[in-house]
Amino acid sequence: MEKNNNKKRATVRIQGQTYKVVSSEEPAHVKEVASYMNKKMEELKKRNPYLDSTKLAVLTALNIADEYLKLKRQYEGE
C-alpha cells in the first residue's frame, strides 16, 4: 500500500458540487480531468435535460469508457 506522503490535494467542481480529491497526480491534472468530466456531463445534460444526477454520472462514465476503449484499441493496433 502506498504511503500518503506523495499525495497531493485538489478541489474541483463538477455539476455544481465541490469535491476534495487526494491523488498522486498534480492538482493541475486532476482539475483537467474534472473539467473534462464536467464538459461531458454538460453535453449529455443538454441532450437529456431530465436525467437525474446519478443517471447523468453513470451515462457520462459509460461514454468516457467507450471513448477510452476505442482509443486504446487504436493505439494497440487492433
From Swiss-Prot:
Localisation per UniProt entry: Cytoplasm
BP terms from Gene Ontology: division septum assembly; FtsZ-dependent cytokinesis; septin ring assembly
Gene3D superfamilies: 6.10.250.790
Gene Ontology cellular-component annotations: cell division site; cell septum; cytosol
Superkingdom assignment: Bacteria
InterPro entries from the UniProt entry: Bac_CellDiv_Activator (IPR053712), Cell_div_ZapA-like (IPR007838), Cell_div_ZapA-like_sf (IPR036192)
Role description: Activator of cell division through the inhibition of FtsZ GTPase activity, therefore promoting FtsZ assembly into bundles of protofilaments necessary for the formation of the division Z ring. It is recruited early at mid-cell but it is not essential for cell division.
Protein name per UniProt: Cell division protein ZapA
